[in-house]
Regions:
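FAD-binding subdomain of flavoenzyme oxidoreductases
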Residues: 1-10
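A short local loop/turn or secondary-structure capping micro-motif enriched for an aromatic residue
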Residues: 3, 20-21
């Protein structure tokens, strides 16, 4: 589907021994280290979602201003204007979530909840914005002649890798419950 230039392949290690001095963490600590790395990489994935969404909005806006239907550019139709407005406000909200998650990471502050929020929200925004862009393009948006269909395919995979939308919601909920527990007792 999306991101065809980025191949993903499994790497399998069988009967591999790692000398103690080459361990990245203590024995049995690898999973924790890998999960901590996601707190740093998820905002980076989220910023990619924001970029996809912004590109889709720019293309859809330009197209809506040029495409004439019933004697006027489709950008003059209120339904299209509402779609463009919703796309813009959601992109800005996603961008701000990404900035917060990245800022926390830069400060060395635990950001599991914020990283998951940024990744989940930005990925969902990218999917919705690209779907709206395809809708604004109409039948042409579904073809490979216009880049919005590729952006939509690329947006879909971001909802899946580095943790699905459902996993992000679990991370968010668990962090909220931990925070509430700490403040109540």
């Amino acid at each position: 589907m999306g991101q065809r230039a980025s191949n993903t392949t499994p790497v399998i290690f069988k009967n591999v021994r790692v000398p103690k001095e080459n361990l990245l963490a203590g024995e049995g600590e690898g999973f924790k280290k890998a999960m901590a790395a996601l707190d740093i990489t998820r905002p980076m994935i989220a910023v990619g979602s924001v970029g996809i969404a912004r590109t889709a909005l720019e293309l859809a806006t330009q197209y809506a201003k040029k495409r004439v239907q019933f004697g006027v550019p489709i950008a003059q139709h209120q339904a299209v204007q509402f779609m463009l407005a919703d796309m813009a406000k959601d992109i800005e909200a996603a961008r701000l979530l990404v900035w917060k998650a990245a800022w926390l990471a830069d400060q060395g502050i635990r950001n599991s909840k914020e990283a998951a929020m940024a990744k989940a929200f930005a990925a969902d925004v990218a999917m919705q914005v690209t779907a709206n862009a395809v809708q604004i393009y109409g039948g042409m948006g579904y073809t490979k002649w216009h880049p919005v269909e590729k952006l939509m395919r690329d947006a879909k995979v971001i909802q899946i890798y580095e943790g699905t939308a459902q996993i992000m919601r679990l991370v968010i909920a668990r962090q909220l419950l931990l925070e509430t527990e700490r403040t109540l007792y």
